[in-house]
Swiss-Prot record:
Domain FAD-binding PCMH-type: 73-248
Keywords: Cell wall, Disulfide bond, FAD, Flavoprotein, Glycoprotein, Nucleotide-binding, Oxidoreductase, Secreted, Signal
Protein name: Berberine bridge enzyme-like 10
Taxonomic classification: Eukaryota, Viridiplantae, Streptophyta, Embryophyta, Tracheophyta
GO molecular function annotation: FAD binding; oxidoreductase activity
Length: 527
């Protein structure tokens, strides 16, 4: 009898993880959902959209901001499960297991490689946009935020309760909390308060067996550590996060000053490299490098734009800038004082005077074809090398760069405290941005080739062994998993997580030995 039981269990496990036996019939998926435990007031199949449903395409495309993965040839899920209750999530997980389907978990849909809504094997999308509660506790200065809420919704709900509290997270307000936090999450408050995950102290998650853990005690410290920067989709379905809100002044000061190479940008960039990571931690100054028309017809040049925010009034900002970066010659007329919540709109390029209620719109206003890559810079780039970089920018034309300064609080937090390892020793992070609007495979190949060409060119100036990368700027070019092996995973894992990768693998092997939760860049199990 014991032998029979063991054989039965082995057969069950084998069936649940073998994608070659996956059931791809959407109707069979709906029937499976209805066989699972259900909430009588909200049947499981009622929230599942299949291709024959008139709303399927609308629901699927609603959170696909990257047109590279919104084509007729893009692999489609057999269903989009728009979960509204924990029971819906449990049922979806149960059917993924029963029918040998992959689960792709989507909160905001901003995965730059489309991994939250595409797959090369039979799959369905578990859409978390129905989970968007933000519960702010002013007494404790904390909040619970569901993983399907956007950063804009989080910021707005905080501002409803207080104009002197905020949260350190991203600048794009349509980012989903679930994906943003699970990759680390950073923005213009990171030099003062660190990353999003540095201010998370609780969470809830559903595991591969449908078990629900509603706090860090029940889920265990290892799992809690892993889902704060290690890619939560490798460990389960995160329901939400308990976060610590941070103090912000009644007024912050923002500015944006641009200079071309002909106007002295090279000198300013050289000074920015030593200034931005070492200045007052209340000040964050991003540098963007873009291509603009030159003074002569048909000539292009590089525009360096310094975009800053100071946690305080403009007079104090000017004191800091005159002391640490006088070369920029920042004037009071360059500065605008505003509430922190209004600075959120400034950083996301909304026109001045836009009502903050726009933050409640979870959808991207304009979709584009997009590619992102990332790097970390640990030593100053010489003037000669900077000249070569600017020359290359003009040559490739399409690439834009954001240089985001570290230092401050980022340099004080140990690299092992969370899976996000890029702490002390980093001067700044580079985000490579390639956006285009023209459709066509040949156009896409051209722009992706330019992105890779520029990335290769930057090799001597950035980190090495490994060449580090930021998970939230996901890039399949640095490695991907075909067979879900440890050897494959280590290629990209070491770049995203450095030494923390091994602990992530150990945790994964302990709590998900069958590798139920996987994608092209998930954490592998150790075999």
């Amino acid at each position: 009898m014991e032998k029979l039981l063991v054989i039965s269990l082995l057969l069950l496990i084998s069936t649940s993880v073998t994608t070659s036996q996956s059931v791809t019939d959407p109707i069979a998926f709906l029937r499976c959902l209805d066989r699972q435990p259900t909430d009588p007031t909200s049947p499981n199949s009622a929230v599942a959209y299949i291709p024959t449903n008139s709303s399927f395409t609308t629901v699927l495309r609603s959170r696909i901001p990257n047109l590279r993965f919104d084509k007729p040839t893009t692999p489609k899920p057999i269903s989009v499960v728009a979960a509204a209750t924990w029971t819906h999530i449990q049922a979806a997980v149960g059917c993924a297991r029963e029918l040998s389907l992959q689960v792709r978990i989507r909160s905001g849909g901003h995965d730059f490689e489309g991994l939250s809504y595409t797959s090369t094997v039979p799959f369905f999308v578990l859409d978390m946009f129905g989970f968007k509660t933000v519960d702010v506790n002013l007494t404790e200065r904390t909040a619970w935020v569901d993983s399907g809420a956007t950063l804009g919704e989080l910021y707005y709900r905080i501002s409803e309760k207080s104009n002197v509290l905020g949260f350190p997270a991203g600048l794009s307000t349509t980012l989903g909390v679930g994906g943003h936090f699970s990759g680390g999450g950073y923005g213009n408050l990171m030099r003062k308060y660190g990353l999003s995950v540095d201010n998370v102290f609780g969470s809830g998650i559903v595991d591969s067996n449908g078990n629900i853990f509603t706090d860090r005690v029940s889920m265990g410290e290892d799992r809690f550590w892993a889902i704060r920067g290690g890619g939560a989709a490798s460990y389960g379905v995160v329901l939400g996060y308990k976060i610590q809100l941070v103090p912000v002044p009644e007024k912050v000061t923002v500015f944006k000053v641009g200079k071309t190479v002909g106007e002295g940008a090279v000198d300013l960039i050289m000074k920015w490299q030593s200034f931005a990571h070492s200045t007052d931690r209340n000040l964050f100054v991003r540098l963007t490098l873009t291509l603009v028309n030159g003074t002569k017809p048909g000539e292009n040049t590089v525009l360096a734009t310094f975009i800053g925010m100071y946690l305080g009034r403009s007079d104090k900002l000017l004191t800091v800038m005159n002391r640490d970066f006088p070369e920029l010659k920042l004037k009071k007329t360059d500065c605008t004082e505003m509430r922190w919540i209004d600075s959120v709109l400034f950083w996301d390029d909304y026109p001045v005077g836009t009502p903050t209620s726009v933050l409640l719109n979870p959808l991207v206003a304009k979709k584009l074809f997009m590619k992102r890559k990332s790097d970390y810079v640990k030593r100053l780039i010489s003037r000669t090398d900077l000249g070569l970089i600017l020359k290359k920018l003009v040559e490739v034309e399409k690439v834009k760069m954001n240089w985001n300064p570290y230092g401050g609080r980022m340099g004080e937090i140990p690299s092992s405290r969370t899976p996000f390892p890029h702490r002390a020793g980093n001067l700044f992070n580079i985000e490579y941005i390639i956006d285009w609007s023209e459709a066509g495979d040949n156009v896409e190949k051209k722009y992706l080739a330019l992105a890779n060409e520029f990335y290769r060119f930057m090799t001597p100036y950035v980190s090495s062994n490994p060449r580090e990368a930021f998970l939230n700027y996901r890039d399949l070019d640095i490695g991907s998993s075909v067979k879900s092996t440890y050897q494959e995973g280590k290629i990209y894992g070491a770049k995203y997580f450095k030494e923390n990768f091994e602990r992530l693998v150990d945790i994964k092997t302990t709590i998900d030995a069958e590798n139920f939760w996987k994608n092209e860049q998930s954490i592998p199990v150790r075999r």
